[in-house]
UniProtKB/Swiss-Prot annotation:
Entry GO terms, CC: ESCRT I complex
Feature: compositional bias, Polar residues: 8-17
Protein name: Vacuolar protein-sorting-associated protein 37 homolog 2
Native species: Arabidopsis thaliana (Mouse-ear cress)
Cross-referenced PROSITE patterns: VPS37_C
Length: 218
């Protein structure tokens, strides 16, 4: 009997889904056709860079699987994850990540255990800054002031000023000696000896003062 369009058998054939159509992939189909993709990737995932040796090893494992097993990897996310974590490369990376996690936790625990010591050291540093450092700073300021006074005392201007005061003092002593001689309070011989000594001292200091002043100006 001829089957016409719209017959019951044809409608049943059209409404029955095929086995291949029922296996809907859990990833985007466009990712499978990508030549640079060595495994199914979720949408938005950045492709990982695999070395040629690792890629060859993965391909060798996939070549040993049947078509049904490959289809299951493409359609079943759990099966794919199980296969992925069975790879040596993934196992090594997971082990490294676990070791890093444990090491990080270990360092964090050590830091927490050393927290009291760190606080104690901070307190000691604060005490040093507020006490010992303050005392040392005060002593340093005192020494700086002494140094400034010494430099000021022995500066050319200060030396000339003191030399001028010494000249004036000798000049005053000479005038007082003259006054005593005029009042007959000292004899001539003693007056001449003392007056000569005073005037020699005055002129010697005057020459030094003149030489120092000339040198500082030059």
């Amino acid at each position: 009997m001829f089957n016409f369009w719209g017959s019951k058998e044809q409608q049943q054939g059209q409404s029955r889904p095929s086995p291949e159509a029922s296996a809907t992939p859990w990833y985007s189909p466009s990712l499978v056709t990508s030549p640079s993709s060595s495994r199914p990737q979720t949408s938005g995932q950045i492709p990982s860079h695999v070395s040629p040796g690792e890629a060859a090893g993965i391909i060798a494992i996939l070549k040993d699987k049947s078509v049904d097993e490959l289809r299951k990897l493409l359609s079943d996310k759990d099966a794919y994850q199980q296969f992925l974590h069975s790879l040596d490369q993934v196992t090594i990376q997971n082990n490294i990540r676990e070791e890093l996690r444990k090491e990080t936790l270990h360092l964090a625990r050590e830091n927490l255990e050393k927290e009291p010591q760190i606080v104690e050291l901070r307190n000691q540093c604060r005490i040093i800054r507020t006490s010992e450092l303050a005392t040392a700073q005060e002593k340093l300021n005192e020494l700086e002031n002494q140094r400034e006074e010494i430099l000021k005392f022995y500066s050319p201007g200060s030396l000339l000023h003191r030399l001028q005061d010494a000249m004036n003092q000798v000049d005053e002593e000479s005038e007082e000696l003259q006054q005593k001689f005029m009042e007959k309070d000292i004899d001539t011989a003693a007056f001449v000896q003392k007056y000569k000594k005073l005037r020699s001292k005055y002129h010697r200091r005057a020459l030094i003062h003149l030489a120092a002043k000339t040198s500082s100006i030059g």
